[in-house]
Amino acid sequence: MEKSALVYVGLTVVTVFLGIFVKNTEFVPRYIRGGGRYGESRCATRQQAANRAASFGVYCLLAGVSACRIAVGNDYWVYRDNFKLIAQNRHVSSEIGFNFIVKLFQDLFGYDNYLPIFAFFSLVTVFFYVRALEDQGSYYAFSLFLLMTGGYYFNSLNSVRYYLALAVALFSMKYVLRGEYEKFVLWVLAGAFIHKSILLVIPVYLAARFLASARLKKWHYILGGGFLCSLIFCQGLYREIIFFFYPYYRNSVFDNGHLSYVNILKCVCVLILCAICYKRSLGEDVMNRFYFFLNLFGLVVYCCGSFIPEVSRVGYYMIISQIFLLPRLLAQMEKGWLRRLAYAGVAGAFGMYFILLLREMYAVDIRLLPYLNWIFN
């Protein structure tokens, strides 16, 4: 493994260590119920100050590594070429909001000055990730560990537009949980100016929130079964809807009918853990139930949505909620050997996934390693 991989390993270790100093267990439930982010008191307590300081440190490290990169990612130079086309007012397939920002930055910093553009999107993407952890991460350090080892941060060095939209979607979950649906829709619409795929989360997150607070009846299961059947028998209709928004995906390399077995396995394992913890953690806990239904939706998409181009990206909008659900389930389990085994299993599985991810980062279609930055390279 190349030495620059130690940058990613060290970043994960140091940020998770900083995350240990963030104690959010009491603040998150209050915030989701409508309270302040760090409690009700306007005068910061010592713990609130520690939370802010540690979280700011996490942000600086994550943003720094991302913003200072150069030639990292298989689409880095593709984006650079698109930046030039945008500055020339040529047609590109990216959304109007993204194009506006790119053109503005080149007007300010000069034609083909691409480093500030990548840095800006890095700073914004990491901001939404960290704010989501602050607002919803009852167990901040563990959620951060899952975010890092699950690849959501490192993959944001690729596919800049998509991962910014994913970070906005993660951030916007809190508004669904708080019942502030207008804010949720506005944030999603803002994200759609960067990547239209985020529009998917409006019906998906609202459906998960409805089911989380409802007592399931027979008609819920009938509707669910009907939707499942539609994914099997109405694939042509769904494909036409997708190609209306993304016509260049038709018959492209992304339209390959690929099944993501790793993500299917992740969803199945999470749902098994949910079944084990149902009485203690899912019965009346709306947050946990919301995340549970998102993972259930993700499993359905991965199992029945192979006709969707880039199906993994569609599913990520749902299964990224695992970074909040798993720590809550594990913490609420009764102390004993089963809890210790579950902690070890989750940490070990994500750790192994991270190791495999590091090995794959050298692949031509990923190219996240070697890590280069414009300061030293």
Located regions from the model:
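Membrane-interface transmembrane helices that cradle and orient dolichyl/undecaprenyl
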Residues: 169-182
